[in-house]
């Protein structure tokens, strides 16, 4: 089995933590580094959350702090979903794990420039780090094997009627990424909302046990509450984890190639990913857009990763 080399760029975040857990443990993934961006909460909080998850699960991968602000727009956070810390719910031990001193954008550029073009970027938060890296060093573009991102929607948004949170948090950065010419795979809300984590799924992961089962339960019981209160959903979708699922086995997710453009004009559609599903614009497709996911396969994959953290000695 080929191991996919990835850099996970995230804003932890409840579903980010699940993506981290999967990426660090599955044998099909070679997690080179974790870069942190502001998004679900401010950078100081998302960084602490990422380090806490790494410490709890003994994920021995370097963590780098990145962009504290969007490129242009005023900063927003998703405290209605992720709480005051950005990862409300779990209680962690005192933090001793530290981030690297190198800035995340520099790490991304240096790692890609030294590579053979075999590294996939997996941004599951706002695209600020990725866009700034592209603008600072355009020579990285042909070095990126693929970008598999969580963001956008071809239907309804979740932060505005038009826009999904990750894209709305930094639409100008998203515009840079979607016009970069790099192969893109987009896991938008239309797909990720199919991964609603019900009480039955939480109980299943609790039964699987170990530190990851405990963390999964604490994380998803919190989002069960906030997702129902905000959106009436029967549980919290694990949006970001779908990107890791796709990288492990793309056959579990049906995609459709489309031309996707990010609306950066002020107004009700600011931050919308305009997906030309019918091809009416006649422009060449630039993105594989996730349509449906085999949820039985997906939750089996999550459980496999949860069980991977159980110590046998």
From Swiss-Prot:
The active site is at 11 (proton acceptor). This is Pyrimidine-specific ribonucleoside hydrolase RihB. Binds 1 Ca(2+) ion per monomer. Belongs to the IUNH family. RihB subfamily. Substrate binds at residues 227, 239. Ca(2+) binds at residues 11, 16, 124, 240. Gene3D superfamilies: Ribonucleoside hydrolase-like (3.90.245.10). The gene is rihB. Homotetramer. HAMAP family: Pyrim_hydro_RihB. The keyword Metal-binding applies. Hydrolyzes cytidine or uridine to ribose and cytosine or uracil, respectively. Has a clear preference for cytidine over uridine. Strictly specific for ribonucleosides.
């Amino acid at each position: 089995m080929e191991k996919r080399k990835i850099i996970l760029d995230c804003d932890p975040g409840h579903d980010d933590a699940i993506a981290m857990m999967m990426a660090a443990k599955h044998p099909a993934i070679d997690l080179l580094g974790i870069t942190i961006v502001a998004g679900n909460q401010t950078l100081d909080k998302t960084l602490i959350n990422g380090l806490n998850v790494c410490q709890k699960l003994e994920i021995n991968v370097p963590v780098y702090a990145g962009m504290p602000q969007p490129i242009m727009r005023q900063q927003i956070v998703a405290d209605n979903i992720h709480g005051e810390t950005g990862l409300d719910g779990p209680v962690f031990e005192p933090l001793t794990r530290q981030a690297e001193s190198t800035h995340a954008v520099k790490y991304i550029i240096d790692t890609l420039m030294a590579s053979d073009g075999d590294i996939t970027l997996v941004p599951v938060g706002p695209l600020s780090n990725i866009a700034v890296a592209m603008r600072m060093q355009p020579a990285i573009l042909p070095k990126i094997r693929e970008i598999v991102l969580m963001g956008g929607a071809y239907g309804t948004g979740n932060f505005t009627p038009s826009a999904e949170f990750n894209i709305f948090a930094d639409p100008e950065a998203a515009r840079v990424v979607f016009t970069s010419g790099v192969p893109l795979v987009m896991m938008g809300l239309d797909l990720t909302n199919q991964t609603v984590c019900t009480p039955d799924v939480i109980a299943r992961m609790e039964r699987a046990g170990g530190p990851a089962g405990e963390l999964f339960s604490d994380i998803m019981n919190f989002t069960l509450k906030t997702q129902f209160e905000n959106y009436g959903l029967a549980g919290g979708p694990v949006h970001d984890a779908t990107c890791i699922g796709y990288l492990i086995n793309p056959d579990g997710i049906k995609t459709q190639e489309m031309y996707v453009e990010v609306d950066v004009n002020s107004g009700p559609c600011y931050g919308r990913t305009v997906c030309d599903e019918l091809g009416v614009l006649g422009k060449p497709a630039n993105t594989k857009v996730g349509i449906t996911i085999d949820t039985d396969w997906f939750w089996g994959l999550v459980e496999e990763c949860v069980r991977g953290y159980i110590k046998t000695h």
